[in-house]
Amino acid sequence: MKKLFNEFAGNIDTYIMFKIKEKTAQLKDELTKKGRAPISLSMGAPTTMPPKFLLDATKEALDEKGMHTYSNPKGEKYLLDAIQTRMKNRFGVDIETNEICSLIGSKEGIANFLRGIISPTTNEQEKDIILIPDPSYASYGEMIKVSGGKSYSMPLTHKNNYMPDLDEVWANLQKDGLNPDKVKAMLINYPNNPLGASCTFEYLQKVVEFCKKHDILLMSDAAYADMYFEEEYKPHSALEVEGAKDMTVEFHSFSKPYAMTGWRIGWVCGNKEIVQQFAKLKSTIDSGIFKPLQKAAAKILNSKEGDEYIVWANQEIKKKADYFVKAFTEELNWEIKNVPTATFYQWLPVPKKYANATDFCNALLEKSGVVMVPGDAFGKYGAGFVRVSIVCSLEELQEVVRRMKEDGFTYNAD
């Protein structure tokens, strides 16, 4: 058979989470027999049930007439109105409904948006460049690759407080022989996956100023904007910055704050011309979101029940995060420099006895049944670290610590 997939689609890697899930499944029976049934700290997905209010609203919508037909790919009016209100109430951002487009999850939105703005070519010198954080969400680089572009890393390190020096990035890009005129967009993600780090409003102002100066689009992935522990670290929207709407689009998700990752619903908002052009692209790719999901999402977004659920969920994550940091430092002697202020992620250095993060994760899985993700899956600046997702129960976290201590997985173990 002739080669079917083009150079871009044919060269993408399997998503790291699927690789880990597959390996864990292969070892499950063996681990369970020896009292080490797998405990996953790998997937970035809440394991709690969504709010009852949301489930009830969905059931109610299922019986409404007209709910089972095609929906508007831009989003039904009731959803767009709810998003408009949410952006104003949560961030103080004035958005018109024609500056919003619904998404089948923010992952789909970002992938299709990149497909729309990148001009694909196999000529390395001519490829459009997207600036991305490093470490960052593992799919960003592959999304760009499959769209026919190339990514360029903006290092997030403890030294720069996970807010890269943009002028330094720009200078390094040119030192590396790349053409700055080919930079199409900058993609940022705060609070950050995998680090759990947030940025300041002042930094967002610098980002907007930088993008305007160099005439590049700002894409802000705000999937974790409602997952934070303290009011002083409450995440901002990039659209709060004066003039940001001139060259910014921001992606939001219902998945994380309401524990509805499988529902696949989110939105993008920002510059009207850009969002409307993207909506045209979307209309050729999909037929929108199932209406009952939109109806329920619209109801939860600005409800007392929804806000109370977010507060409760964040308090639960904070309890687990506090336990995790205390147990790993005091019982397992770990050195933790980065203590997250948001999300359900922890970012740990790999014990010195291991050559790399993959070796450590494999040993931990095979001996203790504990599943973590190698940091270099999120970029070259993730080398030497692992990402831990504390979405399991507190009791399971306690079992993780017990197993690791019993099996010799302390930070300074020989």
Model-derived regions: residue spans:
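N-terminal small-domain helix-loop-helix segment of the aminotransferase-like
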Residues: 3-105, 112, 300-303, 411-414
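Helix C-cap/helix->beta junction micro-motif
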Residues: 27, 31, 147, 213-214, ...
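Structural signature of PLP-dependent enzymes
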Residues: 278-285, 301-325, 357
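Active-site PLP attachment segment
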Residues: 240-277, 289, 384
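PLP-dependent enzyme catalytic core of the Aspartate aminotransferase-like
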Residues: 85, 89, 174, 354, ...
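Conserved glycine-rich beta-strand-loop-beta hairpin in the small C-terminal domain of fold type I
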Residues: 294, 298, 314-325, 336-350
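Conserved core of the PLP fold type I
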Residues: 63-210, 226-227, 233-241, 245, ...
